[in-house]
Amino acid sequence: MSTEHKQYLSAVTLAAIGVVYGDIGTSPLYTLRECFSGHYGFDVRPDVVFGFLSLIFWMLILVVSVKYLTYVMRADNAGEGGILTLMSLAGRNTSSRATSILVVLGLIGGSFFYGEVVITPAISVMSAIEGLEIAAPALDPYIVPCSIAVLTLLFVIQKHGTGSVGKLFAPVMLVWFLTLALLGLRSIIANPEVLAALNPKWAISFFVEYKSVSFFALGAVVLAITGVEALYADMGHFGKFPIRLAWFTVVLPSLVLNYFGQGALLLKNPEAIKNPFFLLAPDWALIPLLILATLATVIASQAVISGVFSLTRQAVRLGYLPPMRIIHTSEMESGQIYIPVINWTLYLAVVLVIIGFERSSNLAAAYGIAVTGTMVITSILFCTVAWKNWHWNRFLVVFLLMVLLIIDIPMFSANVLKLFSGGWLPLSLGLVMFIIMTTWKSERFSLLRRMHEHSNSLEAMIASLEKSPPVRVPGTAVYMSRAMNVIPFALLHNLKHNKVLHERVVLLTMRTDDVPYVHNVERVTIEQLSPTFWRVVARYGWRETPNVAEIFHRCGLEGLSCQMMETSFFMSHESLILTKRPWHLFLRGKLFIALSRNALRAPDQFEIPPNRVIELGTQVEI
């Protein structure tokens, strides 16, 4: 390995530590404390401490190290990961019915992420700020205002991008993980018998001894692996090897040392359960640790916010969410984006959650159900990919799925039991997003099908125009066409009302391919349909934002010259009229109309100069 490659690998691995592992890296702030919360009724006794530590350790090994880093990360689409990517891969070689089921599962998983993303910033920052009550108990009433203030600042700076401050994320998180390791190691040295919990017999004995109560406690243990989906979702940014290298060399050892250090502290001083993380530190280090913890939780929150921006863009490009304003905050990094409506909706939800739950311990009950639900779906989708796409032995796939679900389903079931103590929150938020995504996709499909049914053949219309040509005016007209062989509504209305055509007519169709990026040489396909008609198909990946200026530039390179300021863009604007429906479909239709009215207009989507756009309205019944 060359020196340059080693330096590059080190830099990417460090960057992965700063972004990928923020959520799971801040879990020690609250996980072990929640295991002994009043919900489960466990006393701080050695066998219970050993049991929880053993469960946490083997959860990190089996779920993170084996399931995600060894298996799930094999499933990539041109290097990209994430639940929607896995959904797309799983549906490539299955029947239409199976594909529909897999799509529903993928959308449920994506919806769970929206539910989780509201909780992560709130519980992370609150857990860090709660260190104030250890340093100065009189400051306890200020935990909620301080948490809101920190998160307000974080959401405000989103529109400016995080490129400059983002360079500090990796060093800060590296210091954080080293601090976790040192604090834990210091406590373990004072009480080394805690290392006995590495033996899985303690986890097994815990279940045997405490039976059903130990099953309920899985709802707290799972907090140790929240954020595990980020490893897969961020695979496209950093690559598989750097993410794996960061986990096994820095993150996993630091987490294990800190959890076991907290356990050693509890063996020595059971009263430390009120906040075992901060009580690991000597008195002189408490304030610096509080500041570092706050920075780490802010970085973890930033990673989650960036993740929801990326997921939203992917959902928009794949047609599961209406078009919305997406702002690129960096000229160098295409992945750095800002979506105002998502940013401020998320901010409002996070603030309401902090005010409503008041303490991170109250919010912990809501955490986990979305994470474990996504884990179950990930296992099913991954095994489908292994069977249908990679042609693994069917019996091997069934065995692997059973092993994965033996781990996933008990954790999900334990969290479902927390439904009425907070679990309803991510489920409700996820349900809202699922309804929005399925409504937009299905109603949009029905609308386009209805419009196509009432449209004539494009080839027949062109042939008719060649035989009986209308009046021609100078210039080029571009008509946005959703389907290649269908006459755009705007073209029909222009002929009907104005009875003229431009000298040159371009039918432009935007296509989103099932890949993150499309090579420039494959960007544009040009076909001349007649002496005056051209069809242009522009292809983009779901990580890209279409741009008409770029399309025209590519057209010019291939012989079709179009000057933006000398071209008129004709677009249709549909006014939707709701027909008589059953009540549930009526409500869905109302939601679709509301989403359509607030969707980003096509000129803004494709960055077309407003003074070159002509919109023609039409009424469509749905």
UniProtKB/Swiss-Prot annotation:
Keywords: Cell inner membrane, Cell membrane, Ion transport, Membrane, Potassium, Potassium transport, Symport, Transmembrane, Transmembrane helix, Transport. GO terms for cellular component: membrane; plasma membrane. Belongs to the HAK/KUP transporter (TC 2.A.72) family. It is found in: Cell inner membrane. GO terms for molecular function: potassium ion transmembrane transporter activity; symporter activity. It catalyses: K(+)(in) + H(+)(in) = K(+)(out) + H(+)(out). Pfam families: K_trans (PF02705), K_trans_C (PF22776). Responsible for the low-affinity transport of potassium into the cell. Likely operates as a K(+):H(+) symporter. It comes from Yersinia pestis. It is a multi-pass membrane protein. It comes from the Bacteria. The keyword Ion transport applies. This is Low affinity potassium transport system protein Kup. The chain crosses the membrane at residues 9-29, 46-66, 101-121, 137-157, 165-185, 213-233, 247-267, 276-296, 337-357, 363-383, 395-415, 416-436. One of its GO terms (biological process) is potassium ion transport. HAMAP family: Kup (MF_01522). InterPro entries: K+_transporter (IPR003855), K_trans_C (IPR053952), K_trans_N (IPR053951), Kup (IPR023051).
